[in-house]
């Protein structure tokens, strides 16, 4: 069974919060590329989902995909792909749905901090609404969302 995590990096693995290192030039040095500025604890949560589901990552971020892909690969994340760069939210939805259809994906989730999430859900077909998981850009990928994603990808809900 092929499982995919469509990942928007900004707001999911890097967050907007004064209490985190994302906003400073000094990052946690787990990821040496300053442009990526991913929070290590958020990346570990993504790693948990992948380890527990055997899902592959498809980057949907309009945010420095080249260095993000390189840094994730350097940290042993495999099976990386990406959608076209810098898609607006309507094109992103269509891009995801086309990718799912063309690649015969069995299960997928979308981790995105899109601010107009209700409008997105209006555009998504009913059978896929649970696959779109709203992320609060000030918290990023939480433990609760990680567990939900794990259960969804493994047909436990």
Map each language-model feature to its residues.
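Short amphipathic alpha-helices and their capping/turn segments at secondary-structure boundaries
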Residues: 1-4, 100
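Alpha-helical substrate-recognition element adjacent to the catalytic core
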Residues: 3-90
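C-terminal cap/substrate-recognition subdomain and adjoining C-terminal extension
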Residues: 70-157
């Amino acid at each position: 069974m092929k499982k995919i995590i469509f990942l928007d990096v900004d707001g999911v693995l890097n967050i907007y919060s004064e209490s985190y290192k994302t906003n400073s030039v000094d990052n946690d040095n787990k990821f040496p590329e300053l442009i990526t500025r991913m929070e290590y604890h958020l990346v570990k949560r993504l790693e948990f989902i992948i380890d527990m589901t055997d899902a592959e990552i498809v980057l949907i971020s309009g945010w420095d995909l080249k260095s993000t892909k390189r840094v994730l690969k350097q940290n042993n994340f495999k099976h990386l792909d990406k959608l076209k760069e810098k898609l607006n939210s309507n094109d992103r939805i269509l891009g995801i749905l086309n990718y799912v259809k063309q690649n015969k994906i069995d299960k997928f989730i979308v981790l995105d901090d899109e601010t107009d999430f209700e409008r997105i859900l209006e555009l998504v077909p009913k059978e896929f609404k649970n696959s779109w998981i709203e992320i609060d850009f000030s918290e990023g990928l939480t433990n609760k969302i990680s567990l939900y994603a794990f259960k969804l990808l493994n047909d436990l809900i």
